[in-house]
Amino acid sequence: SDNVTLFVYDSDGNLVARRTKSGADLQAHKGVNLNLPDGNYSLVAWTNLTDGTEIHDAEQLSKAVLGSAAYYAGDPIIHHENDRVYFATKKITVVQSQFRDEELLFDQAHIPLHVHVTGAAAPATRATAPIEVDIVNLHPQMGFDGASTSALKSVYRAQLAYDAETGDYVARVNAFRFLNDNDIQLKLSNSGGEICYKTVELADFMNEHAISVEDKDEAEIAIRFRFNNTSVEGHRSDTKIGIHAKV
């Protein structure tokens, strides 16, 4: 969805306005018009939200969060990737005698993790794969300050698709923003999870390949699991740039 949802909070952090506009409406009306009393306000905006994301406790800025609908439903393993969410915030001061234009600049609130698996057997049917990849300790929720709720962690199962031309399994999981120092793990197992072939500590992988996701507007990470005759290895993927960032 290209909708933008704007939240306006007063100086006490109370929600005083909420507006949702489509991209077309924003272009046609050149933004969102707000008529606010004199005072100081915090603007928070999110875009690309779908039914897969829920907003909770939006009435108070200090408590407002958004996160995976599957997490809020209590699913122990989340099978749907997070939305490709972008986030913007700004503090403004309103004086009635002035008309002001304020611009919000959006930052990426998610980091795509691209997973490739090479050398695994082809699926017996389109609906079955002999392997599964779990991403462990991903944050299922973010605060309205654009930071993940670090105390909350979930398991996301990558939805692997088989590429008959290359023989690879590929998937993308949109993780909410995390830091270079993290405890995220990628686990490659057989279907059902009884046998774990390989576990990659993402922080170690990022350090080994000089990958940083901090202080960047946009970032993505790609990792390839490769089966050989005796073991499974984890590599920085050549199919996609391992880290791509616009500063």
Language-model features: where?
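Structural motif
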Residues: 1, 116-126
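Tryptophan-paired
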Residues: 3-58, 125-210
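Residues that act as N-cap/strand-start positions at coil-to-secondary-structure junctions
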Residues: 28, 86, 98-100, 109, ...
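Catalytic micro-motifs at enzyme active sites that drive phosphoryl/nucleotidyl and oxygen chemistry
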Residues: 31-32, 101-103
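Structured interaction patches on ligand/partner-binding surfaces of diverse proteins
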Residues: 51-101, 193-227
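A short, Gly/Thr-enriched small/hydrophobic beta-strand-prone motif that recurs across taxa
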Residues: 105-119
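Hydrophobic, glycine-enriched assembly/anchoring segments
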Residues: 215-247
